[in-house]
Swiss-Prot record:
<feature type="disulfide bond">
    <location>
        <begin position="129"/>
        <end position="139"/>
    </location>
</feature>
<keyword id="KW-0732">Signal</keyword>
<feature type="glycosylation site" description="N-linked (GlcNAc...) asparagine">
    <location>
        <position position="48"/>
    </location>
</feature>
<keyword id="KW-0964">Secreted</keyword>
<keyword id="KW-0325">Glycoprotein</keyword>
<keyword id="KW-0960">Knottin</keyword>
<feature type="disulfide bond">
    <location>
        <begin position="116"/>
        <end position="130"/>
    </location>
</feature>
<comment type="similarity">
    <text>Belongs to the UPF0506 family.</text>
</comment>
<dbReference type="InterPro" id="IPR021712">
    <property type="entry name" value="UPF0506"/>
</dbReference>
<dbReference type="Pfam" id="PF11703">
    <property type="entry name" value="UPF0506"/>
</dbReference>
<dbReference type="GO" id="GO:0005576">
    <property type="term" value="C:extracellular region"/>
</dbReference>
<feature type="disulfide bond">
    <location>
        <begin position="123"/>
        <end position="134"/>
    </location>
</feature>
<feature type="glycosylation site" description="N-linked (GlcNAc...) asparagine">
    <location>
        <position position="32"/>
    </location>
</feature>
<feature type="signal peptide">
    <location>
        <begin position="1"/>
        <end position="18"/>
    </location>
</feature>
<feature type="glycosylation site" description="N-linked (GlcNAc...) asparagine">
    <location>
        <position position="20"/>
    </location>
</feature>
<feature type="glycosylation site" description="N-linked (GlcNAc...) asparagine">
    <location>
        <position position="110"/>
    </location>
</feature>
<keyword id="KW-1015">Disulfide bond</keyword>
Length: 150
């Protein structure tokens, strides 16, 4: 609401300035009109204009963007800072992955949430790797494979 008032005042000032620079004969009428306008009249006109806005006037892209963003929102308050699978993560508290997902980094504090890390991806703990083995900050192939004979 305050921004609407500021925009309306800014428009009035620009109209006054443009009229003053182009035509000096209308200077007195513009000043009289601006003096007659009170703050309550400005508020009433802004309220009337905002009431006339219909939902169908919004572009379809805005509506679909709002729907897709609503799907990506965390469902509970404790998931406020965590991201779901495929979303951006940075391995920080504010951009961490939810649940058992891990952050696969593509750059410095730039990654994507995945189920587990593939071979030769940056890791800190063995639980992050699909193979279950993290060695020297890289996921390694699990060489300890149990062979079960039937």
């Amino acid at each position: 609401m305050n921004t609407c008032i500021q925009l309306l005042i800014l428009c009035l000032v620009t109209v006054i300035n443009s009229e003053n620079s182009t035509d000096h004969s209308t200077e007195n009428t513009i000043e009289n009109e601006t003096e007659d306008v009170t703050k309550t009249e400005l508020l009433k006109t802004i309220e009337n204009e905002t009431e006339n806005v219909i939902e169908t006037e919004l572009p379809e892209t805005v509506e679909t963007e709002i729907q897709t963003e609503a799907l990506n929102l965390p469902q509970s308050p404790e998931q406020r800072y965590c991201r779901s699978k495929g979303q951006y993560c940075s391995r920080t508290y504010f951009h961490r992955c939810c649940g058992n997902l891990v952050c696969q980094l593509h750059g410095f504090f730039n990654g994507t949430c995945v189920d587990c890390l593939a071979e030769r991806k940056f890791c800190i703990w063995s639980s992050e790797c699909c193979s279950g083995r993290c060695r020297l900050f890289r996921c390694r192939k699990n060489t300890h494979v149990k062979v079960i004979h039937y």
